Amino acid sequence: MPLFQNATFHISAHNLSDLPAPAGIEVVFAGRSNAGKSSALNTLANHNRLAFVSKQPGRTQLINFFSLGNDRFLVDLPGYGYAKVPEAVRKHWQLTLASYLSQRPCIGGLVLVMDCRHPLTPLDRQMLNWYSPSGKPIHALLTKADKLSRQAANQTLQQVRKELEASWGNCSVQLFSSLKKQGVEEAETVIGRWLFAPEDDVPDAVA
């Protein structure tokens, strides 16, 4: 049974003032619009509509918290990089996300979701620059791996791993496909390690 099988919606926030009081551990999912972030969350939770998968990139403009129980949360940040978002909205989210990532004390790790065909865009790099000074771990999901040949996907994986280690450190990276369910167990292992201390009993599904 997936580790996040029982994840449930907790709260949405438009501003930092709307965030719940810091408690427990939050694992944050970030990525460009249409990179497959919501699909990855849904796949990990084995829930088709846990994170809203919009046909229109950039539509979800809220920080969404999903509870795993025991003050453990998955946090879905708004997708970035959608050209049709008004400039005022873009600036609001730049400030909000930069502040959240750099100041939120209970973040346990960042999952950076990138389309494996277009990894490490300038906005992905900006996200890494905002977050990496925290010293907390980063795990990159190279999504839509089924769109590339195995050889091309593995070449991309090695290239991204090399650049992440050289430029930001404390990073891990993997291939992922929501369509083929590729990489689900690997992602669960990494995220579960962030959410639960070694002495904790990690259940098959978090209640």
From Swiss-Prot:
Keywords: Cell cycle, Cell division, GTP-binding, Magnesium, Metal-binding, Nucleotide-binding, Septation. SUPFAM superfamilies: P-loop containing nucleoside triphosphate hydrolases. GTP binds at residues 31-38, 58-62, 76-79, 143-146, 176-178. The keyword Cell inner membrane does not apply. One of its GO terms (molecular function) is metal ion binding. CDD domains: YihA_EngB. Its cofactor is Mg(2+). InterPro entries: G_ENGB_dom, GTP-bd, GTP-bd_ribosome_bio_YsxC, P-loop_NTPase. Mg(2+) binds at S38, T60. One of its GO terms (cellular component) is cytosol. The keyword Magnesium applies. GO terms for biological process: division septum assembly. Belongs to the TRAFAC class TrmE-Era-EngA-EngB-Septin-like GTPase superfamily. EngB GTPase family. Necessary for normal cell division and for the maintenance of normal septation. HAMAP family: GTPase_EngB (MF_00321). This is Probable GTP-binding protein EngB. It comes from Methylobacillus flagellatus (strain ATCC 51484 / DSM 6875 / VKM B-1610 / KT). The gene is engB.
